[in-house]
Regions:
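Terminal amphipathic alpha-helical/low-complexity segments used for targeting or macromolecular assembly
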Residues: 1-160
């Protein structure tokens, strides 16, 4: 389900108590909203500020070497962030700000993730490919594949 289509609710007093016991803190607990299936069980050592929305954590991630990690948020600061269902966010040295993190995302051992103001995340930007001198620009868009970029760069002047 898309994060924008989820139904959110305020945290209950019991959930806030559990989060506090798990060393979580918020500048304003009333700004934190969670999905109906949310459980605070997998949220530890997290600081919240601004408007934060959190999905449910039901899934485990299988990592190299046979390690399994349950989705959840641990050791992070979130500001104006929406976290989709079944994400694993761990060990964020500084913070994540002004982001919508899609479902099943895995973010670990990062310094800072933020966006300020309006951002296209590269959509519509032309980049030079195959030659540092230019002339083979490809416009980036969110569904661009390597195969499409190849055709755009090498066959751009052929009408068919």
């Amino acid at each position: 389900m898309d994060n924008t289509m989820m139904n959110y609710r305020k945290l209950t007093a019991a959930e806030i108590d559990i989060l506090k016991a798990q060393r979580c803190d918020a500048s304003d607990w009333s700004q934190i909203e969670v999905s109906d299936a949310f459980s605070p069980e997998y949220v530890h050592y997290v600081r919240f500020s601004g408007r934060v929305r959190i999905g449910a954590f039901r899934k485990e991630f299988g990592l190299a070497g046979g390690i399994r990690k349950h989705s959840g948020i641990r050791y992070a600061t979130l500001h104006n962030v929406t976290v989709g269902d079944d994400c694993c966010i761990e060990n964020v040295k500084n913070y994540i700000a002004n982001y919508e993190i899609g479902r099943d995302s895995f973010i670990e051992n990062v310094d800072i993730i933020l966006t300020d103001g309006v951002s296209s995340f590269g959509n519509g930007v032309e980049v030079s490919v195959l030659s540092e001198t230019g002339g083979r620009e490809v416009m980036i868009f969110d569904r661009l594949t390597a195969q499409t970029a190849y055709v755009m760069a090498l066959y751009r002047h052929r009408p068919e």
